[in-house]
Structure formats: structure tokens, C-alpha cells
């Protein structure tokens, strides 16, 4: 009887597994993946691979301080689009974020943060950034600009 019961449960689980199918990652539309490239108004569309790579890098490296787009060290400045646009220089486009990840500056652009914020210019201080390529930095910057489109809580704009 016990064996019959186990076979029945296994059959039911197998049936549901084949009928339901596997869960896939969110399919992003082209319009969702299209983001500002530069201050001149140019745009770029990240590929699914670039988005996934940027997301992986963000989760592995950036979420230590920027979980869900918030900033652990300063709750007044997040990675929300409004805060990025309010920075000096603006950081609401891919090339500006790439520049920031190479040579970080304070929110007002006055102070050099190369010893305070992870960047690829100082691999001696931030070894986690040591092996990132230009493409990796581009991808994580792109992910940072796409993320607010995917989660209304990104950057602490709601429920914060």
C-alpha cells in the first residue's frame, strides 16, 4: 500500500511538472530595453544578453550598497531616475554612468570619490571591479537604467 501511495504521488508531481512547464526569466520588450545613451538624446537598446550580464554584475557587486536601487550610505540619493537626473553632471544615461564607474564624483560633481566608491580606475582598492571589461561596465550601467522600468520600488520611490 505504501509503495502504491508513493507511486501515485510521484505520478501526480510528474504530471504537473510536464503540464505546467518551466519558469522562464521575464521577457523584456525592445521598448523596455531602450534607454538613454547620452545627454544629446541618443538611445541604445540593450540585448537580452547585455541585460542579463548587467544584472548579474549589479547583484554580485553593487547590491552590497545599492540593494533595490537604494543607497546604503546616503538614503537621500538613490539610483532612481529622478536622482540620477539631478546629479551634476547628470547620470541618467549610459555613458554618464559608465564615466561615473570609471571616475566617481560626489552627487554635486565637486569631490573625487575614487577612494570611496567602487570603480575600475582603482583596482588596488576595489578588487571586485578588477576583471570587469568596458562591455561589462556598459551592461551594468544599462541595467541600472532599465531596472526602474521593472520595479516601481526601485530607488526607494515607494514604500521607503
Curated annotation (Swiss-Prot):
Q: Name one GO cellular component term.
A: plasma membrane-derived thylakoid membrane
Q: Which cofactor does it need?
A: heme c
InterPro entries under this entry? Cyt_c-like_dom (IPR009056), Cyt_c-like_dom_sf (IPR036909), Cytochrom_C550 (IPR029490), PsbV_cyt_c550 (IPR017851), PsbV_cyt_c550-like (IPR016003)
Q: Which UniProt keywords apply?
A: Electron transport, Heme, Iron, Membrane, Metal-binding, Photosynthesis, Photosystem II, Signal, Thylakoid, Transport
Membrane topology, record value? Peripheral membrane protein
**How is the cofactor bound, in the record's words?**
Binds 1 heme c group covalently per subunit.
Q: Which Gene3D superfamilies match?
A: Cytochrome c-like domain
Q: Where in the cell is it found?
A: Cellular thylakoid membrane
Signal sequence extent: 1-25
| Positions annotated to bind heme c | 62, 65-66, 117
Keyword DNA damage carried by entry: no
Superkingdom field: Bacteria
Q: Which terms in the Gene Ontology molecular function aspect does this entry carry?
A: electron transfer activity; heme binding; iron ion binding
* BP-aspect Gene Ontology terms: photosynthesis, light reaction; respiratory electron transport chain
Upon gene disruption, the observed phenotype is: Cells show decreased but not abolished level of PSII and photoautotrophic growth. Wild-type growth in BG11 medium, 30 degrees Celsius 30 umol photons/m(2)/s; dramatically reduced growth in Ca(2+) or Cl(-) deleted medium. Slightly reduced growth at 30 degrees Celsius with 25 umol photons/m(2)/s, no growth in Ca(2+) or Cl(-) depleted conditions; no growth in a double psU-psbV mutant.
Question: What's this protein's function?
Answer: One of the extrinsic, lumenal subunits of photosystem II (PSII). PSII is a light-driven water plastoquinone oxidoreductase, using light energy to abstract electrons from H(2)O, generating a proton gradient subsequently used for ATP formation. The extrinsic proteins stabilize the structure of photosystem II oxygen-evolving complex (OEC), the ion environment of oxygen evolution and protect the OEC against heat-induced inactivation. Low-potential cytochrome c that plays a role in the OEC of PSII, required for normal function or stabilization of PSII.
Q: Which family does it belong to?
A: Belongs to the cytochrome c family. PsbV subfamily.
NCBIfam families the record matches = PS_II_C550
Oligomeric and partner information:
PSII is composed of 1 copy each of membrane proteins PsbA, PsbB, PsbC, PsbD, PsbE, PsbF, PsbH, PsbI, PsbJ, PsbK, PsbL, PsbM, PsbT, PsbX, PsbY, PsbZ, Psb30/Ycf12, peripheral proteins PsbO, CyanoQ (PsbQ), PsbU, PsbV and a large number of cofactors. It forms dimeric complexes. The cyanobacterial oxygen-evolving complex is composed of PsbO, CyanoQ (PsbQ), PsbV and PsbU.
Name the chain's protein.
Photosystem II extrinsic protein V
- What organism does the UniProt record list as the source? Synechocystis sp. (strain ATCC 27184 / PCC 6803 / Kazusa)
Amino acid at each position: 500500500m505504501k509503495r502504491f501511495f508513493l507511486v501515485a504521488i510521484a505520478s501526480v508531481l510528474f504530471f504537473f511538472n510536464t503540464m505546467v512547464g518551466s519558469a522562464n526569466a521575464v521577457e523584456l520588450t525592445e521598448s523596455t530595453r531602450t534607454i538613454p545613451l547620452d545627454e544629446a538624446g541618443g538611445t541604445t537598446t540593450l540585448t537580452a544578453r547585455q541585460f542579463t550580464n548587467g544584472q548579474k554584475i549589479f547583484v554580485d557587486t553593487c547590491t552590497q550598497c545599492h540593494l533595490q536601487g537604494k543607497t546604503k550610505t546616503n538614503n537621500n540619493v538613490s539610483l532612481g531616475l529622478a536622482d540620477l537626473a539631478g546629479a551634476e553632471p547628470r547620470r541618467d544615461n549610459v555613458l554618464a554612468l559608465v564615466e561615473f564607474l570609471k571616475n566617481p564624483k560626489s552627487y554635486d560633481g565637486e569631490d573625487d570619490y575614487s577612494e570611496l566608491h567602487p570603480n575600475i580606475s582603482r583596482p588596488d582598492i576595489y578588487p571586485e571591479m578588477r576583471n570587469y571589461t568596458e562591455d561589462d561596465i556598459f551592461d551594468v550601467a544599462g541595467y541600472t537604467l532599465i531596472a526602474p522600468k521593472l520595479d516601481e520600488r526601485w530607488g526607494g520611490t515607494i514604500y521607503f
